[in-house]
Amino acid sequence: MASLRKTHPLLSIVNNALVDLPAPSNISVWWNFGSLLGLCLITQLITGLFLAMHYTSDISMAFSSVVHICRDVNFGWLIRSIHANGASFFFICIYMHIARGLYYGSYLYKETWNVGVVLLLLVMATAFVGYVLPWGQMSFWGATVITNLLSAVPYIGNALVQWIWGGFSVDNATLTRFFAFHFLLPFVIAAATMIHLLFLHETGSNNPAGLNSDADKISFHPYFSYKDLLGFIILLMALTSLALFSPNLLGDPDNFTPANPLVTPPHIKPEWYFLFAYAILRSIPNKLGGVLALLFSILVLMLVPILHTSKQRGLTFRPLTQLLFWALVADVLVLTWIGGMPVEHPFVIIGQVASALYFLLFLVLSPAASWLENKTLEWS
């Protein structure tokens, strides 16, 4: 008689996704980040739910309610600390996951990849509206600066900004709707994740060799379930260590000051995980141009499958494109550094060069290098 997990209408879905799923035998630790992202999402949902029970989305009480959570709620300080730092770990895992996809050519599963890019945009939107909720100085001014960018939209720009604000400035209506969005979006992310997995399981996983692995598959459980468990333990240990030992390491000191519309902080900057995009935005002197560059810095990922010119899938046996990949990694790190620096010489020119290189690597240099490698190997 067949096992219940194989015959039950609901359990069979779980079984086919987590137990009897055929997986390539040679997938490395870089394939762990998908499940780590699932863990991050669950952690954020649980801690966020408990925070929402005690948070008040009113400009006169928001900052005080966060203080109340940290001082008066049982383990409130820990829940908040895990939630705030969990966001950083979420983005570390996302960027690693995307880097893996770029390196090994996983983007050739176009549906999975495009849903992934949509997921990235959703997570970024969620993180942005979440950062506004404590209603500190950087929350308020970050919301003001970033929402103001929409005024660059031709003709309807100003109306659009006032519509999002719910008034003529970032005020109570803005905070209330941002809280609503911050509560709603993670559930949309969870649904999109299911679609992401659905498309992935249509094709099966890619592997480091970039070759068809149908001839050499092993079951997900116990092999990769235990491998993922190791990743879970490492991630949770790192997260709790950061949350317990230096919870404010990645935050901005300005956010310990309640929001004041009359005092502008000396340097308005987002959390570290948005700095690369913020640097690209600032490197273009024109407002609309900057906004388009900001948007395209993420949407360029959707062009990667279209611009894939190589006869090989991954970069495992392509030294020239490997060099460009690591140049891209270095470039993003430089942009992250520049995003946190004041707008003055030499940071402006470094940011402009790094921004130009970012788009060149995606749109020109990588496809050209792939074409050259094909020619060298006489595969064209």
Swiss-Prot record:
A ubiquinone binds at H201. InterPro entries: Cyt_b/b6_C, Cyt_b/b6_C_sf, Cyt_b/b6_N, Cytb/b6-like_sf, Cytochrome_b, Cytochrome_b_C_euk/bac, Cytochrome_b_N_euk/bac, Di-haem_cyt_TM. Its cofactor is heme b. Heme b b562 binds at H83, H182. The keyword DNA repair does not apply. The chain crosses the membrane at residues 33-53, 77-98, 113-133, 178-198, 226-246, 288-308, 320-340, 347-367. One of its GO terms (cellular component) is mitochondrial inner membrane. It is found in: Mitochondrion inner membrane. Component of the ubiquinol-cytochrome c reductase complex (complex III or cytochrome b-c1 complex) that is part of the mitochondrial respiratory chain. The b-c1 complex mediates electron transfer from ubiquinol to cytochrome c. Contributes to the generation of a proton gradient across the mitochondrial membrane that is then used for ATP synthesis. Belongs to the cytochrome b family. This is Cytochrome b. It comes from Zu cristatus (Scalloped ribbonfish). The gene is mt-cyb.
